[in-house]
Amino acid sequence: MVEEATTQDQEHNIKLVFIGDTAVGKTSVIMTWTQERFPVGYEPTVFDTYYGTKNYAGKEVKLQIWDTAGHDDLGRLRPIAFVNTDCFLICFSLIDRNSLKRACSKWVAEVKATAKNCPIVLVGTKLDLREEREERARETSSKVEQDKLL
């Protein structure tokens, strides 16, 4: 059974949920950020949870990071991860032009339907593999403004 957190605990605990298409790099971003290592090879995720601690503004912030499956077959399970989320990070691949479109049409809609007032951050992945940087940057900025994302 989950215990209720005190107000003080809630101020220092943040739940982040990463969502996006299969193979856009959600797990790679999470592992690089929390474990300071880049994963070798690709293994599809169903659900996974990572924990980390970061120092922000002189305070220790405990992170609970949910890595969700991008595969459509698991779409009914995904909202389980959405409960009590503080921020959604919607990932898209910078090397796949359609990935940004799906992020904004599919994933933003899914989050807004389930967690209406939760912040959404759009995360472009695979920057190291990207070409046509300026054009993609303009497209991304336009989508961020249009959908009121961070």
Sequence positions of predicted segments:
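ATP-binding glycine-rich phosphate-binding loop
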Residues: 46
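Conserved glycine(s) of the Walker
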Residues: 25
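Post-Walker A helix-loop "phosphate-sensing" segment adjacent to the P-loop in P-loop NTPases
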Residues: 35-43
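The conserved Walker
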Residues: 22
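Ras-like small GTPase catalytic G-domain
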Residues: 3-19, 28-36, 49-150
